[in-house]
């Protein structure tokens, strides 16, 4: 079930209940604020492990040379950079992000690293993708779905633009599975992380929201069911690092 309420027109922004129409603006303010320090944010949130998670996410994707890939919530280009090696010179990647600041950081970073060929940048909303039906072999979203207002619609859009036989993959912070670890994780998320955000980025509020958004994100089984409801088949998930993150995948047949 999507986090938006059709009856009240409200949704969650972290632990706050806000008008659904306002969430995009509030999320945009967060990511505009953290865009120049996005990698630092991920390091603080994951204790630096996010790079290994992303490498595994791409390494286990169904993608081959010549494929056309859509990377949603492409951020600073980490996933696109890894995918470029998989699709090769014959393939292409579209890096999409709703936030112009994030997209700019990603473009500059990839250009600085010499990654320019067969790579397009599109500012787009995952709930209303500006692409034709059945035009991508793989659709990925890394650490972005929890910030989407209507997750069900976004998953349906991912399904729509995917070719028959293609795969969608979502890498996202999830629900920790080890009971003994939950108090430690909560302490890091709600006590340590905002203080680090204030110290290194002068922005405790954005980091507090990001921690809260993880707790409001659907747990593994629920998100798997949501992907099935969007039309995907063979929906699976794999927990990494005790469920701190999970990789969800589904196919279009």
Swiss-Prot record:
S-adenosyl-L-methionine binds at residues 76, 97, 125-126, 142. CDD domains: AdoMet_MTases. Signal peptide: none annotated. InterPro entries: SAM-dependent_MTases_sf (IPR029063), UbiE/COQ5_MeTrFase (IPR004033), UbiE/COQ5_MeTrFase_CS (IPR023576). Its EC number is 2.1.1.163, 2.1.1.201. SUPFAM superfamilies: S-adenosyl-L-methionine-dependent methyltransferases (SSF53335). Methyltransferase required for the conversion of demethylmenaquinol (DMKH2) to menaquinol (MKH2) and the conversion of 2-polyprenyl-6-methoxy-1,4-benzoquinol (DDMQH2) to 2-polyprenyl-3-methyl-6-methoxy-1,4-benzoquinol (DMQH2). Belongs to the class I-like SAM-binding methyltransferase superfamily. MenG/UbiE family. This is Ubiquinone/menaquinone biosynthesis C-methyltransferase UbiE.
